[in-house]
Amino acid sequence: MKKMIYATIYTMDRDHPTAEAMGIEEDHIFFTGTREEARAIEVDESLAYPNQVILPGFIDTHVHVIPSGLFMTGADLSQAEDLAEVLELLRAKAAETPEGKWVIGAFFQDKHIKEKRFPNRYELDSVSTKHPIFICHNDLHPFSFNSEALALLGFDPALDGVCTDENGELTGCIVDPACVDSLERIYAFFSDEDLLKGCEAVDQMAAASGVTTIFGKDSIRVLKLREQNKERFCAEFKPMWMTYNTKDWEGLREILEDEALREKTCICTFADGAFDGWSASVIEPYEGRPTEFGMLLNTDEELYEFAKAARAHDLQFSTHAIGDHAIEQVIRVYERVLKENPKEDHRFRIEHFELPTKQSVKKAAELGIALGMQPLLIEICEGMDLSGYACFIGDRAGKCSPYRSILDAGILVGGGTDFPVTPMRPLHGARICMTQPTASERITLMECLEMNTCNAAKLGFLEDRKGMLRPGMDADFIVLDQNPFAVPVEALSDIKVEQTYARGKLVYARA
């Protein structure tokens, strides 16, 4: 069936940036051009959007699908002002949760409550001793558990990052590097169907946000479930295997032996943690903590061996690196791997790249390293007044997220959210990038949109099908109630997604 759609269309194709009409046949685009040209084409149906604007479907290059799905059913702690309110919100959630089932507290930032800390196991025990209880920091790094959860998970008190009191008893708080496998331990208590329902919740939210392609950063179990049940979902899924263990050769073998995953999976690991929790690895010490520099989760050699193995099998590789010291390590390792086994268009990635030095930006550009960055980290974590990071890294907060410098260096950047760390709101993210506190690092609306469409597609080797509206591409597009190029910057956040189409199928319509 052929459809012709008439609207103001921004194609994100620099050779043909706008169109007045777009032809859809089944799941792909067969025409873009003028109204006059379109009227000469015989179609089965015509749709007109005289007051709306059409863009390619957004692409989110960094989503933690399963924690997101589970957290969406948990207690939202983002607005809590003190520990008493945190515990009360958890009690309300426990009251509606069957005994023995997990109670999850999500979107928590200890720096935002009066006490500036996580609740300990005994405070969480006051909520319930008949439910395992788990609180996760908004950035997915520090955690806190009650006694029931600790008993189920079996943390070794000797493990670095498992917090104990003066008597050697677990406090319930888990920090890097011990938290690295905590989520995996928790997932084991959820059935496949539980996890798939979490995937569906994220998928539905993505459609409502205009996101038609998700790069899912999850465990092999989750990647396989998502691939085996892809007919249940609207968004296309680009698998990214996330592992903190750079010696997980069994996991790598499992990816290589799965035909579907072998062809499209990006291998992802971690160089450091996050500023919240003081675990991002920095060159200069943390503010007010002259002996603390964060941590590198792997040695150069460990990271090198893992990246080398991925390159040997022609797999894309990605490393989380937030602090300037961690970023330097990753660039150093990538340079070694790519020198030994060159590939012109490797698209090795660094995730976040929040506090790079000028030299790191220059070197990343020289090596052809691509970046997965999340604009809303500026608002949610750094703070529009920089206070969110200034408490950890002082004046260096003003050097975070240097988008202008990165794009001017010619580096490929794909936008994302790190959901659930930040919400799926691409147009709000554009506003934040255009108004960020470091004025010299602001970028244009077109650059913001490219990060979430054509450049995001290229980040995942999907540019032959995704990210632009032109003949031969997938019919992934969204209908907006206002033209983002015709409203004030501050109004970008208020633009609504009216409809979302994925591969030609209407998957969301605003009520």
Spans of model-derived segments:
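Divalent metal-binding segments
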Residues: 2-5, 10, 14-25, 29-233, ...
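Short aromatic-centered micro-motifs
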Residues: 23, 269, 500
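Non-cysteine beta-strand/loop elements that form the S-adenosyl-L-methionine
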Residues: 64, 264-279, 369-379
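Conserved, mostly hydrophobic/aromatic
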Residues: 146, 210, 273, 320, ...
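Extended hydrophobic/aromatic segments used for targeting, binding, or gating
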Residues: 227-261, 265-268, 356-362
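Glycine-enriched alpha-helix->loop->beta-strand junction motifs that scaffold or abut catalytic
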Residues: 260-262, 363-372, 409-412
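His/Asp/Glu-enriched, well-ordered alpha-helical/loop segment
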Residues: 308-317, 325-348, 353, 373-485, ...
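Short peripheral tails and domain-boundary helices/loops at the edges of structured domains
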Residues: 497-511
